[in-house]
Structures are given as structure tokens and as C-alpha cells.
Amino acid sequence: MSGPDPETKMQFLFALRSKGVTDKRVLAAMEEVDRGLFVRGLFSGRAYEDMPLPIACGQTISQPSVVGLMTQALEVNPRDKVLEVGTGSGYQAAILAKLARRVYTVDRHARLVRAAQLVFQQLQLVNITTMTADGSFGLPDQAPFDRIIVTAAAEDAPGPLLAQLKIGGIMVLPVGQSDTVQTLIRVRRTEQGFDYDELRPVRFVPLLEGLGKDG
């Protein structure tokens, strides 16, 4: 499989480290997964720049350093079952699939889900389950989850997602208004309740209810 040239990949990994992505498993997964497969059209030549890029349905593929920092904050273990809310391009799910036992990823846009499925098949990632659904309600039939990651901003951590997090589990998500800078937070579920840590400022598209009208 053709990917970036060695110099581009080296610069990519250096940029990740310089932004604080230091976990060896996360870096190895991001080195292995070709971001270029998830960026199409006019922006395909910019896949290895540390910047968000537009994709279909008015969505974006997050900048790699943010993907790395969110994945690192999630502290994924090899036996974990992970829920991703907001498949988008599929890039984040592909990285999670290198780290976890099973990944469930949902998106409200069927078009994005179909496109991501094709790339997952190309990469032979057989431990990802994709579906078109309103991710703000999670996946009750598959709960509880060891880890949950949300790639769109909500004003607060959605109650259904908190309920589907295992005791001892971690959720990472951006919270805040969609038209301002948001805060990336990490939620840990304990026997007593939930502990919240603020990690860094971010900008994400809003988490919307319902299904997209893209068919």
C-alpha cells in the first residue's frame, strides 16, 4: 500500500510529538494508518499537514495532533471495547482499531459511513462495526463501553453516553457552544460518580440530533 514518502512521515510524527503526542502505541498507530486514504479531492495533497480539512456533508477531518491527543487521553487498552460518536472520515476509528479489541463507530450521515466502510475494508480492519445512527444516544444494545470518544461538540456530556460508560471507563469529548472555542474534557466513571478533567481548547463541529439528509 502506498503512503507518504519517508521524509513526509518523519515530519508528520515529529509534528505530533511537538504538540504533545508522546504515547508510543498511539504514535505507532498513527504511523501505520495512512491519513491520505481518508482525505479526498482538492485536499488530498495536504493529508499530512497538521490541520483540519473539509470532507463531505459539511464535516471535517480533525487535525492529526488533536486526533493523537484525544486518543492518548482515552488511554485505550488492547482488550477495550470503544464507542466513537461521529465517524466522519473514519480516520479516528481506524487508529482506535489498532489499539482496541473492538470499535463501534456511529454517524448521522449515511454517506460518510459508507465511505469510511470502504477504507476500513481496504485496510482490513475487521474489528470496526459501523452504523448510521443518532450518536447522541449512544448504542444501548452494545453498552457498556470501556472507552467512549465523541468527535463533535456538545454543551454538556450527553447523559445517555455517561450511562453507557463502564465503571472505570473513560470518555473524551469537546464541550461548549458550537460557534466558539470549546474545551476538550476527559470524564472518568468511578464507583462514586464522574470525575472531569479539562485538557485543552479545541474547535469541533456541533453534535446534532437526528439523521443527516444525505441518504
UniProtKB/Swiss-Prot annotation:
Superkingdom in the source lineage: Bacteria
Keyword Transferase: yes
Record EC number: 2.1.1.77
A Pfam family this chain is assigned to: PCMT
GO cellular component: cytoplasm
Residues annotated as catalytic: S62
Main subcellular location: cytoplasm
Family note: Belongs to the methyltransferase superfamily. L-isoaspartyl/D-aspartyl protein methyltransferase family.
Job description of the protein: Catalyzes the methyl esterification of L-isoaspartyl residues in peptides and proteins that result from spontaneous decomposition of normal L-aspartyl and L-asparaginyl residues. It plays a role in the repair and/or degradation of damaged proteins.
Protein name, per record: Protein-L-isoaspartate O-methyltransferase
Organism: Ruegeria pomeroyi (strain ATCC 700808 / DSM 15171 / DSS-3)
